[in-house]
Amino acid sequence: MRRHPSPKPVIILKPGDTESGRRAALSHTGALAGEQRVVDAAFRQCGIIRAAESEEAWDAAIALASLPPLRRGTVAVISDGGGHATIVCDTADRHGLAVPPLAPDTQRRLREILPARSGVGNPIDFAGQAEEEPEVVPRVADVCLADPDIGGVIFAGHFGGYVKIATPELGLREEAAARELVDVVRGHGKPFILHTIYAGERLPVLETLAAASIPMYRSLEASAKAMAVCWRAASRPRAHEGRRRSTPDRVRVDAILSQATPGTPRLLLEPDARELLAAYGVNVPVFRVAATAETITHAAGDLHARLAIKLVAPELVHKSEAGGVLLDVAPEKAADAYRQLAARAASIGIAKPRVLLTPMVSHGLETVVGAFRDPQFGPVVMFGLGGIDVEAIADVTFRLAPLDETEARAMLSEIRAYRLLGAHRGRAPRDTEAAVDLIVRVSELMADLDDVAELDINPVFLLERGTAIADARAVLSAR
């Protein structure tokens, strides 16, 4: 579906959010298991609408089969009760819809229809007027649907059943209002969804609306979710562009992969992981590797900068936690730093330690770019906030590899800390295009190299110009 996006919406009922649900899924042939964030990312990337429950899938199908496309992700919420409107607005917001203030001209027109006590900013509150004068329902819907900044309208309340709480004469007026509402909705060609507590009952008004394919829901939340589904369907991704940024030398790449440590797991230690990234055109900061106090002195002199110096050994996956990293080391102190790290290595059984030294990076936003192979979806790329607390913060997003620039930019916008990438508190914006370039190249690496099971680049300092990779490692698949 990434290569050939469907012109028709696709809904998949995918349960399994709980551990017990995943266990049950695994007990059936052909069950689709997998880490839920990866499933959600894959479906979103392919334009698939995911439903966690059968009723949710049914509600989505009704909306998509009945409604015209939602051209804007903005809705007006009309209600004959403030509580109803609040729930609809909250649910709409949580599912990616905006409920913006209506244009001044739209509000003026609404004030001409509704009593002074009514709210007209969005949501619109009838304040009891519709139960006395049902004709206001199609008139207000007409005004809201005519607003060019509004994509669709959700009505929440008791419409369709006013006859049950009033006189038969009011019921006849409500039926006439329903027929007028049908004409209004058809005339504007925008989605209109009705929430009513009487949904499912055999009432004349509701039968009129059903005959006109206006979807009706008894649940406030379902009404808002149904409109959100229309927006997701309208925002389906286009085909993956397929253009590459990287042109790696495969002979060089194979030589780098051959440096993996023996045993299980097979590790590509930081120097080789950096070389692998460089082979894919990633801008890797200059570094040197040394194995003695003498060689580190020469290497430090070449770099002409204060240094980060790190032990390189398969036993040290998390070097900082093991005391295997020294920061902000003056070049003339490099030999002392080596001896300190060598003593630390000896204390944990590493006899002939190597160290990597690279210029310090003391500024920039710490991010992470990672990748792994999902058993269901294949290579997956991750981006988010990085650093030593990356797992605790868990502000990350995922995409299937390979991906293009548009998909990579979308990843940046999905993390909770997205605003930190822009200008913030007097600080210049980060170079997001450099982050996009890194994400795309990593995705191409993962799509090319089946041998690479995991790749962890953390932290990646996102600078005002460019990126600076501070650490990298890879795990290769077992042979």
Where are each of the predicted segments found?
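Catalytic-core regions of core metabolic enzymes
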Residues: 1-479
